[in-house]
């Protein structure tokens, strides 16, 4: 069933049926103030941290509530409804609604009983408060009197676990006050710092554009003994002007609109963590409500559409266009900002950045905003320990040069991460390379950056120490040890077990460093010898003719042998053998074909097969999951991006695009009940063929899938591959395509690219025509590019 459609011109996803299989969400705000809102106005808000800065309460794993609720009441009849379908949930044959999720804003338009409402939710650029503008229009030919209620359920404590669990304490530290047109909540804790370093917490919920007629700061008074669909205050037609003192706080404000026939009026609810003086200043800002809100919304749209304009494509597949031009890109920015911190699935327990997650997330925006990417990349380099490993969790309060590490009990106790992971620092190599290649800024390699615990070094030195960490943590076969994890958090191989996946990552890193250190002949010689030795081990110990094994247990037993009854075929070693250029052309063809035959489904490639049921070992923690789920034979979506890239690198355009289409959210827009989560954002995994719910996706928005699929599509399918010398354009596309166009900004220069595929090839173009001059396909040196360029790629 279809619940909505892509409006690519507006860069919006439009939900026409609000009764979706799961809450379909959008993200608002910035790193300083974040908000999640669904098509039914569910969701929550937080300052800096979803764990330690929670403002709005949200109850996870239930029915998408509470949220940002606006209720409308006909004062003549007493009938009432909500501006979004839920929480009141009027019958959809009489209640018409449409939700437009845009780039950092959401608007819900509804009609009921001759009244049209528009609820616009957004966080202004650079602000740390949110706006809920509500406009109400009388569509009838008679006067109407409409009561409007805004409801925000405030947390009793910024740490969400304290708010939801430690109620014997938190319900007795909060109280509310009413000031001129706003409710103020006070939390009497001054001994714990806020995420921004201040102490004490005050929140406000205010009304601009209308006069408050009644209010309450007590949840129990607003709801009564009912639920959100029938609040007692709305039934009564007003709040009782009571305030909270020991209990559950809320902000509830009511006002009345008198509308003539065809008349429209508007107001706005405002929410933030502010003192009374700051709240008054914000309230004054909206004295000219309509002009201010319109200006702020347009500023948001200009910013985000400007960010997305740095790459624009037009292909024969409109779902592909919608994902690459808008939704995959916007999701990449969202994961870049919030990592895995706060969603409707990630409850906010992680109070920081996962190292591997964030370094990979940076790659997803590199082609759109490389300088923003650089800022976060520099931050993550400063979270690298002096011996080369990355901190598994980088705290929001990270203080480079002064951090504890997994070698310290205090770090383990605070973060829950007991050891280093084999892959963390190796993700720096593709990410640093992508930055240098996208910008041409080789001087970045000489920038001095502190390490997390002690010492400083250039970016180049940071990378050298990452290689050294891998080389000093080798297993019995001379391959990198798997340590506490090797990207797959369910594969714990320790100091003696070895990872083929990480070995190919290391091989990739060694070859990148040869380019970065070309003026250091002795070090380049070491890199060459090390890479040659490692590749020899991989071919002699890990290649079984049609596949690379997954690695070795600490007992020396093989993981992922073709002779194994379970877990005999794994995806990532095959993809990374190709991406790292470790596989020969002949090997690449064979191993990719084996992956296709053994792992592919209508919904994407399964991570490994057959799933573990009986033959697992102690380090194979994926056995905890049901077969066909997550790392145990599920379609883990992040590796789909690597598979897309691998197929594209060998010129398999048909299969690269097949893999994109099979797991793409947009492919399920007409079959949304199967996929369940949003058809405009990637999920973490899809249930595999062993599940009775094959094709169902989970863990929306905050996932590394966003960046890997973006890279796979941009560098692989579209073939846009910046190098340190210039840019290569080598598409790998469906042979049936006649061609497509792209517009890209590269090092400040505009590229207008037309791909001509009248020969109906899958990949490997024959030649380019650059500004009227023919040249062989390959890298276009930067010095050959004008400020504005027309490039024709002949396949």
Predicted regions and their residues:
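Catalytic cores of carbohydrate-active enzymes
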Residues: 149-151, 166, 391-392, 505-622, ...
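Active-site acid/base region of carbohydrate-active enzymes
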Residues: 84, 93-96, 315-326, 371, ...
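Anionic coordination/interaction segments
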Residues: 1-356, 370-379, 383, 434-439, ...
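Carbohydrate-binding/catalytic loop surfaces
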Residues: 343-352, 393-421, 452-458, 477-499, ...
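Aromatic-rich carbohydrate-recognition surfaces in CAZymes
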Residues: 71, 353-358, 362-373, 377-477, ...
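Surface beta-strand/loop "capping" patches
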Residues: 722-753
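Inter-helical turn/loop segments and adjacent helix faces that build the functional surface
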Residues: 137-143, 276-280, 438-452, 510-527, ...
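Short strand-turn-strand beta-turns centered on an Asx-Gly dipeptide
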Residues: 769-773
């Amino acid at each position: 069933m279809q619940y909505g459609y892509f409006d690519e011109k507006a860069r919006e996803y439009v939900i026409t049926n609000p009764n979706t299989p799961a809450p379909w969400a959008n993200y608002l705000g910035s790193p300083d103030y974040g908000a999640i809102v669904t098509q039914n106005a569910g969701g929550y808000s937080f300052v800096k941290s979803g764990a330690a800065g929670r403002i709005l309460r949200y109850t996870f794993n239930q029915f998408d509530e509470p949220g940002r609720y606006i209720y409308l009441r006909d004062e003549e009849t007493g009938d009432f409804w909500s501006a979004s379908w839920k929480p009141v949930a009027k019958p959809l044959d009489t209640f018409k609604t449409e939700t437009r999720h845009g780039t950092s804003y959401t608007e819900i338009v509804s009609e009921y009983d001759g009244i049209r409402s528009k609820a616009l939710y957004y966080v202004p650029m650079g602000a740390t408060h949110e706006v809920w503008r509500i406009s109400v229009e009388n569509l009838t030919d008679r006067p109407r009197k409409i009561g409007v209620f805004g409801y925000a359920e405030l947390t009793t404590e910024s740490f969400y676990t304290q708010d939801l669990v430690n109620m014997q304490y938190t319900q007795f530290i909060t109280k509310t006050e009413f000031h001129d047109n706003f409710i103020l909540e006070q939390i009497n804790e001054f001994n714990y710092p806020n995420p921004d370093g201040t102490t004490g917490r005050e929140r406000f919920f205010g009304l601009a554009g209308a006069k408050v007629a009644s209010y309450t700061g007590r949840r129990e008074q607003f709801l009564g003994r009912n639920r959100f669909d029938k609040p007692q205050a709305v039934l009564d037609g007003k709040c009782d002007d009571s305030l909270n003192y020991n209990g559950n706080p809320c902000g509830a404000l009511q006002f009345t609109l008198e509308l003539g026939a065809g008349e429209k009026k508007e107001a706005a609810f405002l929410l933030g963590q502010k003192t009374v003086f700051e709240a008054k200043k914000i309230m004054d800002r909206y004295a000219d409500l309509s002009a201010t809100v319109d200006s702020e919304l347009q500023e948001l749209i200009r910013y985000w559409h400007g960010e997305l304009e740095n790459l624009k494509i037009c292909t024969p597949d409109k779902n592909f266009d919608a994902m690459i031009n808008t939704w995959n890109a916007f999701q990449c920015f969202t994961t870049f900002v919030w990592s895995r911190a706060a969603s409707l699935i990630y409850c906010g327990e992680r109070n920081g950045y996962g190292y591997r997650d964030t370094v990979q997330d940076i790659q997803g925006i590199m082609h759109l905003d490389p300088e923003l990417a650089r800022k976060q990349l520099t931050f993550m380099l400063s979270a690298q320990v002096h011996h080369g490993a990355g901190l598994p969790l980088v705290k929001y309060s990270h203080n480079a040069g002064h951090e504890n590490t997994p070698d310290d009990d205090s770090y383990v106790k605070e973060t829950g991460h007991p050891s280093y992971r084999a892959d963390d620092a190796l993700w720096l190599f593709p990410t640093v390379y992508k930055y240098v290649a996208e910008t041409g800024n080789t001087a970045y390699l000489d920038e001095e950056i502190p390490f997390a615990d002690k010492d400083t070094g250039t970016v180049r030195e940071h990378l050298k120490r990452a290689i050294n960490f891998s080389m000093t943590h080798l297993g019995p076969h001379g391959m990198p040890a798997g340590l506490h994890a090797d990207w797959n958090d369910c594969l714990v191989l320790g100091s003696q077990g070895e990872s083929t996946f990480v070995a190919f990552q290391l091989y990739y890193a060694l070859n990148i460093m040869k380019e970065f250190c070309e003026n250091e002949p002795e070090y380049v010689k070491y890199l060459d010898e090390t890479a040659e030795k490692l590749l020899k081990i991989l071919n002699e110990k890990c290649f079984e003719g049609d596949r690379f094994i997954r690695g070795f247990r600490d007992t020396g037993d093989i993981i992922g042998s073709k002779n194994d009854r379970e877990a005999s075929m794994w995806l990532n070693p095959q993809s990374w053998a190709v991406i790292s250029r470790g596989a020969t052309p002949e090997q690449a063809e064979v191993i990719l074909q084996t992956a296709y035959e053994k792992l592919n489904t209508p919904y994407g490639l399964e991570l490994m097969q057959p799933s573990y049921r009986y033959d697992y070992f102690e380090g194979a923690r994926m056995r905890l999951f049901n077969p066909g789920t997550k790392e145990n034979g599920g379609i883990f979506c992040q590796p789909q991006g690597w598979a897309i890239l691998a197929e594209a690198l060998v010129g398999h355009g048909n299969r690269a695009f097949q893999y994109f289409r099979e797991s793409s959210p947009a492919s399920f827009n007409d079959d949304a009940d199967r996929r369940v989560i949003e058809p405009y954002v990637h999920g973490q995994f899809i249930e595999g063929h062993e599940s009775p719910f094959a094709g169902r996706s989970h863990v929306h928005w905050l996932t590394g899938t966003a960046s890997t699929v973006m890279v796979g599509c941009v560098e692989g399918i579209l073939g846009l591959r910046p190098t340190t010398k210039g840019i290569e354009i080598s598409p790998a596309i469906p042979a049936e395509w006649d061609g497509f166009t792209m517009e890209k900004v590269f090092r400040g220069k505009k590229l207008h690219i037309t791909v001509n595929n009248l020969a109906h090839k899958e990949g490997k173009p024959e030649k380019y025509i650059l500004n009227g001059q023919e040249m062989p396909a390959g890298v276009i040196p930067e010095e050959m590019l004008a400020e504005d360029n027309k490039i024709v790629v002949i396949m």
